[in-house]
């Protein structure tokens, strides 16, 4: 199970949002780190096939096959949690996931079991019959992760999954990704250093659409040239005046 990006490029008009991006993802948890405008969202939208590469702008391969040719079979392997998604306040958590299961074409009987399973994974089983309008921000975040898990995807893309969570809920997400990362490819986008260094097996630092460097936390901090060897100082080293975008560092 591999996701390979080769020389990927994406322009928005004259803006080069992703520049010659090449990387191979295998089973594990990967953190995409960088300030606003680094290219994280563009990269995720290309991987989820919500955006198309430039003409002659590289290729994205899933298990050796171009995703543009795989179509529905690729999307069936994919779970995506967007940073923002409409939640229906008058629906219960269970009904909301049932609605999304139907849209994904999951048979009703199978969906019932899956919904119970994903709610348990994000520790929302006791709130299954509660209306979403009464959920806290952290509960809504976990519900969005639950919907991404429907269909048991092999590739999971999470956009800012820990944004606005309290420490207890961050632990829930960390434990979940630790377990799922043993059998899935998980990409997590964030600009919060303190979160990603405890969640990710490998971290990719992006700036203005370019992959600056990547590695484990221990590998990355060895690149720090001045001061204490921390991921925060590496961030400052690479981003300088942009570093104030790394809230929570």
What are these regions, as identified by a protein language model?
Residues 98, 102, 109-127:
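Conserved ABC ATPase "signature" region
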Residues 35-39:
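Walker A (P-loop) phosphate-binding loop of ABC-type ATPase nucleotide-binding domains
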Residues 214-215:
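ABC ATPase "signature
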Residues 55-69, 73-74:
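Conserved ABC transporter NBD signature motif
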Residues 156-160:
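Catalytic Walker B motif of ABC-type/P-loop ATPase nucleotide-binding domains
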């Amino acid at each position: 199970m591999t996701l390979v990006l080769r020389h990927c490029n994406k322009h928005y008009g004259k803006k080069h949002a992703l520049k010659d991006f090449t990387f191979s993802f295998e089973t594990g948890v990967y953190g995409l780190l960088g300030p606003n405008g680094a290219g994280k969202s563009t990269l995720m939208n290309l991987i989820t096939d919500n955006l198309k590469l430039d003409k002659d702008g590289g290729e994205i391969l899933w298990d050796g096959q171009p995703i543009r040719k795989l179509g529905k079979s690729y999307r069936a392997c994919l779970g995506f949690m967007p940073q923002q998604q409409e939640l229906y306040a008058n629906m219960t958590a269970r009904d909301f996931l049932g609605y999304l299961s139907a849209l994904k074409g999951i048979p009703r009987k199978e969906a019932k079991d899956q919904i119970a399973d994903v709610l348990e994974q994000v520790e929302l089983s006791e709130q299954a019959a509660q209306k979403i309008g009464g959920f806290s921000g952290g509960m809504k975040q976990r519900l969005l992760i639950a919907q991404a898990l429907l269909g048991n995807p092999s590739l999971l893309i999470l956009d800012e999954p820990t944004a606005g969570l309290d420490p207890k809920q961050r632990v829930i997400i960390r434990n979940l990704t630790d377990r799922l990362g043993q059998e899935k490819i998980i990409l997590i986008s964030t600009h919060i250093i303190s979160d990603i260094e405890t969640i990710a097996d490998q971290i990719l630092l992006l700036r203005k659409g370019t992959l600056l460097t990547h590695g484990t936390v221990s590998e990355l901090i060895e690149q720090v040239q001045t001061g204490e060897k921390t991921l925060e100082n590496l961030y400052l080293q690479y981003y300088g005046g942009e570093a104030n975008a790394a809230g929570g560092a």
